[in-house]
């Protein structure tokens, strides 16, 4: 993920931000509402204004199923926390910051296989249900969707519900010649960068820079 952070930092500087305002290593703590502070992965502070805050998350290995819900809860909670802190004036009288979420998932067979949902009482959201199987004694059964699809839905809904300004979902093989794919056309790195650049241009324009 370090390479992606460097790439995004370079893009921000090319868009007109000062290099010293873009932070990726130290002093990344921002105030919250439900907790005192949270350490973000990349933030931009310019002339006292919070321009943007970003999360870079990744998932690799065989035990991916144990972490999907944790990642989802973390993403939603962090966004709710910082937006409430913004509402309460923790970041001064400035326009809303850009909140970005980038997720990189290891591309392997077990993340592309449908995973059944446990539904002892109620049916899950149809988007997580997947394709319908043959009808059984309890009616239509569904295969469920893969872990990669679950992460795709997470990223899409984080933006749909306005928890994050923009999100990006990437998959990459763990090999000598890494192959990167972008499963969802609405969650590509190009679209993410375009939204990021647009926010920076608007911010600098409001400052007359």
Where are the regions that the model predicts?
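A short, highly charged nucleic-acid-interacting micro-segment common to nuclease
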Residues: 1-8
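Low-complexity intrinsically disordered segments
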Residues: 9, 13, 19-20, 173-209
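A short acidic/basic microdomain associated with nuclease active sites
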Residues: 10-35
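Short helix/strand-bridging catalytic loops that position acidic/His residues to coordinate divalent metals
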Residues: 29, 57-70
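Active-site beta-strand-loop-beta-strand hairpin of nuclease catalytic cores
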Residues: 36, 43-53
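Glycine-rich, often proline-containing surface loops adjacent to acidic residues and nearby aromatics
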Residues: 49-61, 100
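Acidic, metal/cofactor-coordinating or nucleic-acid-engaging core segments within structured domains
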Residues: 65-177, 181-182
